[in-house]
């Protein structure tokens, strides 16, 4: 018996569940992935969608607890971030050469997607949850300076509100602008023209007039429009192919959701899925569940 104990060891890597929020980009966790033929079938379907060989842009990944769904998605995001460790690629190549060929194709074409990880937040609507996840993804990847059209329109809306309802705040804002050698009319004109410098100035002054709060236009906007605009900026200005959204623990969200607001949240999810399906490989949306959606009804 002692001899067997010296020969057989438990791989501790199997004992720790993958947390996408914490483990994304962690090469150590990614390198511990062990490809199987069944998991490669799933990975291959995702990669074929990315390369345009399949049209599955909005999907639900279903499997029981401990099946390796999150670890598989961790590897997928690594591929779509052009950051897959070579050791994992070699393991994929041995297990499934066809999937490895798709990985190689994505590497050659430099198909890079911004990963957006969605988690349910009690008390928040699905609109807010999706926007929060997008803002967090942009910040984490050094893309906070991306300015969608909603940022300019929201700044103009706030200025109009200050002018009509908070004259003292508006007057102080005008004074600050004078210190920066400009005036409110010029600022408004430049905001309408989508000048980034004017938006940066507004963002700089905003905390001085709102007790230190941060200007967060994404959190005040409409989900579909915001994602459309961010995708446009990512593809035209930042070298990305688009966005890949993963709603991990979607099961817990469904099980814990109160009846109030449920229909509206489901409509938001449906709209996002429809946007993904019509996005021409620029948006993918995957929800992770432990059983069929019909079983939750």
For each predicted feature, which ranges?
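Substrate-engagement module of ASCE P-loop NTPases
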Residues: 227-237, 264-284
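Walker A/P-loop-proximal flanking segment of P-loop NTPase domains
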Residues: 1-67, 74, 79-82, 93-98, ...
């Amino acid at each position: 018996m002692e001899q067997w104990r010296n020969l057989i060891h438990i791989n501790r890597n199997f004992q720790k569940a993958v947390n996408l929020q914490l483990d994304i980009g962690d090469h150590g966790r990614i390198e511990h992935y062990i490809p199987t033929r069944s998991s490669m079938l799933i990975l291959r379907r995702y990669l074929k969608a990315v390369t345009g060989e399949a049209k599955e842009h909005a999907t639900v990944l279903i499997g029981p607890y401990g099946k390796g769904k999150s670890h598989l998605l961790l590897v997928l995001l690594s591929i779509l971030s052009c950051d897959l460790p070579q050791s994992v690629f070699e393991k994929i190549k041995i297990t499934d050469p066809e999937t490895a060929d798709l990985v190689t194709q994505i590497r050659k074409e430099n198909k890079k997607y911004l990963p957006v990880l969605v988690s349910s937040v009690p008390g928040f609507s699905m609109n807010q949850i999706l926007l929060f996840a997008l803002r967090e993804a942009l910040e984490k990847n050094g893309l906070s300076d991306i300015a969608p059209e909603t940022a300019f329109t929201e700044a103009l809306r706030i200025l109009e509100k200050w002018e009509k309802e908070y004259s003292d705040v508006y007057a102080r804002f005008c004074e600050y602008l004078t210190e920066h050698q400009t005036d409110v009319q010029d600022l408004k004109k430049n905001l309408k023209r989508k000048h980034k410098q004017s938006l940066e100035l507004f963002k700089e002054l905003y905390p001085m007039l709102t007790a230190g709060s941060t200007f967060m236009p994404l959190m005040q906007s409409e989900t579909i429009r915001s994602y459309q605009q961010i995708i446009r900026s990512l593809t035209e200005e930042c070298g990305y192919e688009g966005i890949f959204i993963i709603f991990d623990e979607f099961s817990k969200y469904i099980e814990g959701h109160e009846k109030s607001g449920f229909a509206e949240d489901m409509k938001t999810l449906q709209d996002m899925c429809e946007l993904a399906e019509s996005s021409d490989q620029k948006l993918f949306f995957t929800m992770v569940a432990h059983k069929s959606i019909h079983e939750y009804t």
